[in-house]
Amino acid sequence: MHLWCTDCNRSFQSESNLRQHLNSKVHRPADVRCPGRGCNKSFVSHAALVLHFESGTCPSRMTREQLNRLVVRADTNNYITNPNRLLTGPMGRYEPPTPTVMWATDRSWNGSAYQCFLCNKTFNKLVHLNQHLQSPSHEDKIYRCPKLDCRIEFGTLSGLCQHVEGGFCGVRMFRQVRDVMDGLTRGFNALTV
C-alpha cells in the first residue's frame, strides 16, 4: 500500500506519518496564537502550543510544572487527568507530583555509552543523558485519554493533545472531548502568563 501526498509528491510508510505530514505547517496555517505575555508566536495546533509552554521556551516563562498544576486544578472531574496519579493536597484538592530533578555524572558511563539509571537507555554524550533526565520521560503519566475503551496515559498534556488531534482512537468525535479541548484553549487565552 502506497500512502501519497499529491500536493508534495511524497510517499509515506505509514498512515500516521502521512497524517502527521498533513497536519504539519506545510499544509496547515499557524493560526493558534500563543497567549503568553511577550510572545507573538503562532502554531499549527493546540498540541504545538502546549509543547511550546512545556518546553519552557515561551517568553512568559510558563513551565511544564505550572501548566500541569493549572490543568489539574481546571479538570475538577478528572476527565483528562488521572486522580490515581495525583497527590491529595489541602482541602482534598488534587495536585500533580512535583518533578524530581536528576542529573547524571561521568559515573553513568558503562564502558560504551552513558546509561540512564532509571530505564537503561543509552546515550553517546552525557549532555544527552541529562536532557533525557530533565524531560518528562520518567514523570508520572497524569493525563489520560477520556475515551473509556482507550484510556492511554500520557506524561505530558501535549502528548494527550497530539493523541486527540490525531484522531488515533476516535476520541475527537465526542462532543464532550471537543468541549474540553476548546475549554483548554479558552483557559490558555484567559491566562495572564
What residues fall within each predicted segment?
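Alpha-helical interaction/linker modules in multidomain eukaryotic proteins
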Residues: 1-193
